[in-house]
């Protein structure tokens, strides 16, 4: 068991009764607005105002948020982003052990959820340091709630790999996922992601593309992956969250399933694993699919 899981009492960040000068400080993960500043809670405003140290993903954006929230603070603001997260975590642990609370704030949403913060959380737990939060909105649950897709069971995939082959392999793994899938994507990669998803998951698989959530130009586009891929080529702008319908076990033709296997193996997945994934996702017989995929491979070799 990691040190600290069982012996740390966690209290709300605005209650100082459990902290004394001889105790370590606390890591406070501060959920910031994902767009509309009115989403900021009174607890967030108070925490930022009273903070002594704020570890910010982008110090300029943090100061802009403070200005928009009309918050004055004497906190020492330090940068804490992917490029310096490992080194800065050690420095912040020293501050925590000296008794200072450290507030972590990312550009938008909840720290450590596809954003900096996770390394500090683990390091704090290992040192027996309290980790708590000021809850705030996240694009994950906001997009899920308004997507129109099932919300009772879902999984979050963060950002898929940037490299096409790795991205396609990950989509192949998700082909059999029965839960609704939520993921993030950069606007300049959205069309490629949806093209790959349409090919691997099916052009008619339902999805929702949510952009600029809670902002003035918020938009939710719903439809099949094929039509959304076409739309994305001209309209992919802003912060993007994609929600994908889970696998329904829809049966496709054996030839279509064999083509899916061929694509997954071309992307580097072993044929046996590709066959198993496609069979579970489509409902075709695994043994029959393996034979057809093998025959198709032999035919391709003869023709080449």
Task: Tell me the role of every PLM-derived stretch.
Residues 2-81:
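Glycine-rich, flexible N-terminal cofactor/catalytic loop recognition
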Residues 2-20, 24, 101, 180, ...:
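A contiguous loop/helix-start segment that scaffolds small-molecule binding in enzyme catalytic cores
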Residues 26-30, 98-106, 154, 179-183, ...:
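Generic beta-sheet signal
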Residues 48-54, 128-132, 180-181:
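Short active-site oxyanion
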Residues 60-62, 109-110, 139, 189:
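Alpha-helix capping/helix-boundary segments
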Residues 79-86, 160-163:
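Conserved helicase motor
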Residues 89-138, 142:
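Glycine/small-residue-rich loop that forms an oxyanion/phosphate-binding "nest" at active or ligand-binding sites
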Residues 119-177:
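Class I SAM-dependent methyltransferase SAM-binding "motif I" and its flanking Rossmann-like core
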């Amino acid at each position: 068991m990691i040190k600290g899981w069982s012996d740390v009492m966690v209290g709300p960040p605005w209650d100082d009764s459990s902290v004394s000068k001889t105790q370590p400080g606390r890591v406070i993960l501060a959920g910031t607005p994902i767009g509309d500043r009115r989403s900021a809670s009174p607890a967030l405003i108070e925490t930022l105002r009273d903070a002594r140290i704020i570890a910010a993903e982008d110090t300029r954006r943090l100061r802009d948020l403070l200005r928009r929230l009309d918050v004055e603070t004497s906190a020492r603001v330090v940068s804490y982003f992917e490029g310096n997260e490992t080194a800065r975590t050690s420095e912040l642990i020293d501050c925590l052990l000296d008794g200072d609370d450290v507030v972590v704030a990312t550009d938008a949403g909840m720290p450590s959820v596809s954003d900096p913060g996770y390394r500090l959380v683990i390091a704090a737990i290992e040192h027996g340091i309290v980790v708590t939060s000021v809850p705030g909105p996240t694009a994950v649950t906001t997009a899920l709630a308004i997507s129109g897709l099932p919300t009772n069971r879902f999984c979050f995939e963060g950002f898929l790999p940037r490299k096409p082959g790795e991205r396609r392999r990950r989509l192949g793994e998700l082909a059999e996922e029965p839960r609704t899938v939520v993921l993030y994507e950069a606007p300049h990669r959205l069309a490629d992601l949806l093209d790959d998803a349409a090919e691997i998951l099916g052009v008619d698989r339902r999805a929702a593309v949510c952009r600029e959530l809670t902002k003035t130009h918020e938009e939710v586009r719903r439809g099949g992956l094929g039509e959304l891929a076409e739309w994305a080529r001209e309209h992919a702008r802003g912060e993007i969250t994609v929600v994908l319908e889970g696998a329904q076990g829809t049966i496709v033709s054996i030839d279509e399933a064999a083509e899916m296997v061929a694509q997954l193996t071309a992307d580097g997945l072993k044929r046996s694993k590709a066959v198993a994934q496609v069979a579970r996702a489509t409902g075709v017989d695994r043994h029959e699919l393996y034979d057809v995929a093998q025959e198709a491979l032999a035919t391709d070799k003869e023709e080449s």
